[in-house]
Structures are given as C-alpha cells and as structure tokens.
Amino acid sequence: MHAMTFKAILLLGLLALVSTSASIAFAKEVRATITEVPPFNRNSFPSDFIFGTAASSYQYEGEGRVPSIWDNFTHQYPEKIADGSNGDVAVDQFHHYKEDVAIMKYMNLDAYRLSISWPRILPTGRASGGINSTGVDYYNRLINELLANDITPFVTIFHWDLPQALEDEYGGFLNHTIVNDFRDYADLCFNLFGDRVKHWITVNEPSIFTMNGYAYGIFAPGRCSPSYNPTCTGGDAGTEPDLVAHNLILSHAATVQVYKKKYQEHQNGIIGISLQIIWAVPLSNSTSDQKAAQRYLDFTGGWFLDPLTAGQYPESMQYLVGDRLPKFTTDEAKLVKGSFDFVGINYYTSSYLTSSDASTCCPPSYLTDSQVTFSSQRNGVFIGPVTPSGWMCIYPKGLRDLLLYIKEKYNNPLVYITENGMDELDDPSQSLEESLIDTYRIDSYYRHLFYVRSAIGSGANVKGFFAWSLLDNFEWNEGFTSRFGLNFVNYTTLTRYHKLSATWFKYFLARDQEIAKLDISAPKARWSSSTMIKEEKRKPKWAIQAF
C-alpha cells in the first residue's frame, strides 16, 4: 500500500484552504481572552522539541491475546459501551503496523507514543506463568520499524488493560499485591525493549482509570457504590478510588526505582508518568471559588503530583477525606518522592469551579469529597466551543495556564504533553470526502500549540507534544462512535485515509526550508451560534486515495 501523493498543484489546493488568520466564533468570554494567532510552524519551537501522536494497545492492536479487564468488561457488559462494540479487532494495528508507521513518516512526526499490553506479554500477569513470545515479537517489530523510520518510541507500560487473571485472583489494584506484580512486569519490559526505548511512561491517566473504573463505574472493571449506580459490578466510591490510586502510585514508584537501579545508567533513558488534568477556572473572583478551583486541582493532578514531589497527598485531600485516605509509610514516602524524570500532561478541556458542601448530601464518595461543583458554563456561556460528544469544551488558553501552574507549583519539571485532541461523532451518512474535512481540528491544534509556545516563552520546561490520536480508534465506553483520529479509519475494511488535519501536520512539521516558509496557519472553522462544533463539509482538493 502507498501513501497519498501530492503534486505541486494539489499542494496549492490544500493551501488555498488554509487562511492567514485562525478565527473561530468562540463564545463571548473566550473571544475576549484568546489572542488572534499569527502564523508559525515547527521552526518556531526549540530545535529539540518533539512532535508525535499517541495510541494505546487495547484501542489499537486487536489480534489474539488472553483477556484484560477491558476484554472482560466489553464482553460481559456490552450495554455499557455506546455501540456495544469492543476492542477485539480495534483498528488491527497488530497487522497494519507498517502502514501506520508509514503514515507517521508521511506526517513528518518525530515520535510515536504506544503502550504495551500486559496480558499480551504475560498471559497470567506474571513471568512465572510464561512469557508470550508472539507478543514480544510484535513489539520488537513495531519498535524496530519506528526506529528504522527515524521515529522515536515513547512507551507506556500500563494503559488500563490489566490482565483479567490478576483481577480475578486478588482484585487487581484494590490489593497491594499488584505493586510487586506491576514492578516485575515493568522490569521485564525494560529488559526486553530498553536497549531501544529511551522514554518510558509508567501509567497513563491514573486519575481517569481510578475515577471512571471505581467511582463512576463506566470503565473497566466497572465498580462504584450501589447507591450511585446499581448496575455496577460492586464497589465503594468512598474508599476504593483512593486505595486504587495509592496502589497505582506505589506501583509507579517501585517501577521507577527498578529502572533507575538496574537500567537507566546503561540504557540512557528517562521515565515518567502521564496525568490527565482539566484546568480549573474559578466561576467568580470570590475567594470561595478560587479555593474551589485549587481543591479541584488538588483532587485531580495534585492527587499524584504532590506525592511524587513532596511524598504526601495534598493537605486539602488529607483534611477532607480523613481516615479514608491511605497514608504512605516513611519508607514509601521516600520511594515515591522524586520518582520521575518527567511529567506527561494530557490536556483536553477546562471547567469552571465553585464551592459546594456535599458533606451531608450522600454517602462518602471521591466524587463529592472535594466539595466543588464544576460546570462548562458561566452565566449560560460555555467556556469554549463544545465538541460533538458533549464532554469537552475547546479552551486552548487553559493549556498555557496549566503548564505555568505546574511550573510554579512543582518546581518546573520536564514536561511532555502526551495527549491533546478533539473528537467528532461517527456519522455514517457522510461521504468519505466529507469525513476527511476537519478544519475545526486543525484550528484546535493550532491554537493549543500557540499556547504551548507561549508557555515555553514564559519559562515552562515543555519538550514535546503528542496529538491524540494517529487514527480513529476504539474510544473506551464511547466505542467507535467518537473519532479522535488525524487519519480516518473505515472500521469495516480497516482502510486508513488522511484527514485534512494529517496533511496540515505534514506541512506544519516540514523541515524543508521552502515548505517551512509557507504560511500554514489554521483554516477558518465554522462554529454554530450554540457553540457546538459543526463543519461545512467541502470536497477536498485532492483525490481520495487509500494507502
């Protein structure tokens, strides 16, 4: 298969779609705070800044493996997935990895963030139960293919697909036993792949795994308090989220310790963790709302960053959660503190925060412990355009604010933005040509990158940006109804097609001096008066061609 070929006239056709201004009809408040974005490209960033895309094993790979908790969850409870689908095939990267690396090469990407499937490597969850050579061979082939194309692998050790065997045996992350099993699994990964992998991420979005899996019950393993949702598989949202997070932190720290003691000196790599953080904007200028915004940050990003930098949970969590919050022993605190070389930040949206007293409304729950209420609106006006899925508002300035907050509060750590993106709904009524036009996605990336550059200019130690995602894929409880990809996937044939955003990235990231001089500003995107993202679907200027 081959990549799309663009002749000079087609390039001109593309650039005709790309205007010198990047104006979005944002809601009034956002329009007042977002600066019109001038032209810039990759040469506007430091020379060592890395651009990549991100993916995960369960969402991408397909092919046979023993079950993870997500295999079990999607098969046992298909009604909990928007379209009843699962990741059995996903986008079949297991068989299409060479094509996918070719896409990355076409897009001029520097790096690819992938994850390793724990049950694909260790069917029982432990090396004592045998190592799956087929799984090891797949990751070796993928890593080698990336390196052969000058693409740097960033590897996540755990992106939510825990072996079902360990969940069945002792409850997974509810049990402290997981810490040793996680460490040993990571040790094996370092041994197998660390000669070529120089950037490791221990855990992806531990707060989301914890909150959605053990408080809301909408992600595997589907646990929550019965009073919140009687269809959950069991659970207690007042204790389990904090316990799971505690064991995730200890698993992370034990893994970092192994890497630094056994591998880092001779493998010359670095290791960190990826956290999703929603930026918190006080609903008003009141002291109460400002404190609410800080508490929200404490209960999300601070939940993990405070232990990693100070060896203990945020004071607000200790006070409000009380005895339900696990405590680090002296030795554990020493192990956890400083256990990172970098912090990965996954940023998608921001929210308004105000105080609420939930202390007497309901049984104790992580969902109410912070005593805040968050909203996407202030006085009926959204903080930013709402994406089709409804949970995300596009607020690029929040990324700059978050990066500068981390710089000031956590002593300016090395940061990679390990995910950023926006969704669109799968719409079978659209033609293929229409499905490839995503100027709103280009505009969103352009503005986020503008604010990343601004944060760097203000001293934030940011060294990379990964778009979510390379391809449309299985989006957890949204199944295949939500498309985040820069490249369109026909889920029946598994054929890949470049969206306009993929080709925009190709030229934004071009190193060729003549191409780099071109104005690759974001095209104008259309937004409805209700601030729900919509797009005028125009036929592309190039022939639709699979690769």
UniProtKB/Swiss-Prot annotation:
Signal peptide boundaries: 1-31
Thermoactivity: Optimum temperature is 65 degrees Celsius.
Active-site residue numbers: E205, E419
Biological process, per Gene Ontology: carbohydrate metabolic process
Catalytic activity annotation: 7-[beta-D-apiofuranosyl-(1->6)-beta-D-glucopyranosyloxy]isoflavonoid + H2O = a 7-hydroxyisoflavonoid + beta-D-apiofuranosyl-(1->6)-D-glucose
Glycosylation sites noted in the Swiss-Prot or TrEMBL record: N72, N132, N175, N285, N490
Positions bound to a beta-D-glucoside: Q59, H159, N204, E205, Y348, E419, W468, E475, W476, F484
Domain of life of the source: Eukaryota
Keyword Hydrolase: yes
Entry protein name: Isoflavonoid 7-O-beta-apiosyl-glucoside beta-glycosidase
GO terms assigned for molecular function: beta-apiosyl-beta-glucosidase activity
